[in-house]
Amino acid sequence: MSDGMSTRPYPLGRSNGYDPALVRELIMGPNPLKLCEETLDDAAAHGSGLAPGSLVLDLGSGSGLTSAFLAAHWQVRVVAADLWGNPTDALVVARRLGLSAQDVLPVHADACSLPFAEEAFDAVTCIDAYNYFGRDEAFLAQRLLPHVRRGGLIYLAISGLTCDVADFGGVLPPELSCSWTPEQLEYLWPRGRWERLFAAEGDVRVERIRDLSCNDEAWRDWVACDNPYAAGDRAAIEAGALAWLTTTEVVLRRL
């Protein structure tokens, strides 16, 4: 595309319909609309779709863009929960996209101390945020699952690496080290590590786990943004870091 946003060999019809300038203004990492769309479409194709009318917790919602995306295209009601984002700003985003607080309700919340009733939500989405808090083995069972109804679904898109950062022995490949230190990459796990973590959970069933095919495109969209964080990551992507970077889709069902 001439505007610099990347393309793919098959369509992501919902996310590709958004104004690239708006997306660049609001995203904080690899394009979350594309990660969200592929995750939910793949889940639906394998029998774990997000039902219209559901009450959804969008955890780590950032600017609120993914929350508005969910409400607009999946006909769900969304509570947008984020520790660092401003709830008023997130509601402004929803209103810019033709929605209201009845569609998207932003709240200030810490993922490790969620202020919601037990079994309040039909589903949870967490797009490119779960690895900030979910690496704690106790998080899912003790902090998140109590707020999801039995039979409810959890949809995750988790940024990661093709291997554990420890496998590099403290010396990153140059295409990674030009932007990041080993310490900065410790929160990026390979898919296999997430598989082992979730397989050990007694209160969920893993419905789906795989790497997203839109990963490279989502990263390229991010480094095309005009902000210092994207600029800092751009050198790695231009040097070939996509050979190491992944995004893992995980779909869990509470038992």
Regions found by a protein language model. Give the residues of each.
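Conserved class I S-adenosyl-L-methionine
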Residues: 155-181
